[in-house]
Amino acid sequence: MSYPLMISLIIEHMIGLTDAVFLGRVGDVALGACALGGVYYMAMFMLAFGFGFGAQIIIARRNGERRYNRIAPTMVQGCYFMLVLAVALFAASQYFSPIILRDIIESPQVYGATVDYLHWRTYGIFFSFLCVMFRAYYVGITQTKILTVNSIVMLLSNVALNYCLIFGKGGFPAAGIAGAAIASSVSEAVSLLFFIIYTSMTADKRKYGFRRAFTLRPHLLKGMLSISGWTMVQSFISVSIWFIFFLAIEHLGERPLAVTNIVRNISALLIMVISAFATTAGALISNQIGAGEQRCLFKTCGMTLKLTYAILIPLLIILCLFPEPVLRAFTDSPSLIAASVNSVYVMASSTLIMAPSFILFNAISGTGNTKAGFIMEMISLAVYTAVIYYGIIRLKPDVALCWFSEHVYGVTLIILAWWYLKSGKWRGKKV
């Protein structure tokens, strides 16, 4: 179950990665603006991701309880909510983003490019938010193989459109960073269309309750929000703090920002491996609790961590032995490659800490006690923000040292999550 999800997450991340690869040939400003715009967009997307993760917990629990006819109504009510949320965020972003970013981005060139990117990128909200619900459905019912196929279709469309729209190939005008944003949004529309067609053709509509799922059910949505509300806020704040990290780096200069964007894209590939296993652990734990097997929680976490390290450690060894060839995929500038190597080493070591922190945190979410997870995340992020302020904004160190803030966040979350799970306070939580 983990491997198809892992592959799909890696492929989906490669949408942002291909933006960085293509824009790295345009210049440092475009590369840095892509980083800021990408994380800004991701903060909005994480509201949907948080809601979808809560919906996934509920779907997985119903699947474990064998109450299959409750699954499709949960998914459809989630889609209704996602559409309303997408409209609200799109309107707010189009109006307020230029005003907000003008006051917090120092470089006029980076500001202009970031606004251009976001103007077109936010159109993808409508498609990506609905895709989150389809992903929650397939992960919740433990049928994740289709996610890989969907992600491949999305990636191929994104690569082709990036090439045409950024550089002006195939009869299209050269749109630069705006072209990258348009390509990403259109590829998400392709992904949604694929999900709709596949689900309508293959889903067991009677078993999962699709035939009567489209009636608006406010009481069901209210129950979903009681679980998903905490994960929504937690996910949004988590990435918003990551945006603050990028803003702190931007104040160090355009070159450190370009370095950080490259390292972020490499880091995100590794985090996708961790996230796939952690998400699977959360879904399995929710299924196990639904089936009355709470005792399996720690065994599931331990097995998941071993499998994660089995893939992660060889990748880290290769990355640390050969950082320059990996960096060359993002830029052809020798000076930018040289400036990024030390940051790669620090980032690589942080992923070893992120693996257990993500798995333990998702285990808490799998128990259904998302409020406890929210509190732990807020404490960890408060510590992380303090490190960003004092360690980056005040001290202005070399960009590689800035990446040690990831270690602090990971260790804090491990301590809190381990304490909570060992306390047994999660037992008996109803979903």
Residue spans of the language-model regions?
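Generic alpha-helical transmembrane segments of integral inner-membrane proteins
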Residues: 6, 10, 14, 18, ...
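Transmembrane helical elements of multi-pass membrane transporters/channels
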Residues: 1-16, 120, 154, 187-191, ...
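Helix-terminus/linker motif at the lipid-water interface of multi-pass membrane proteins
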Residues: 10, 14-32, 101-108, 164-175, ...
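Interfacial/gating helices of multi-pass transporter permease domains
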Residues: 23-42, 74, 108-113, 177-178, ...
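Small-residue-rich hydrophobic transmembrane alpha-helices
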Residues: 31-94, 128-142, 146-147, 241, ...
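Short runs within selected transmembrane alpha-helices of multi-pass transporters and secretion channels
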Residues: 52, 56, 121-140, 147-158, ...
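Transmembrane alpha-helical segments of multi-pass transport proteins
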Residues: 234, 345, 380-381, 394
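Short alpha-helical transmembrane segments in multi-pass integral membrane proteins
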Residues: 1-2, 59-126, 172-229, 285-350, ...
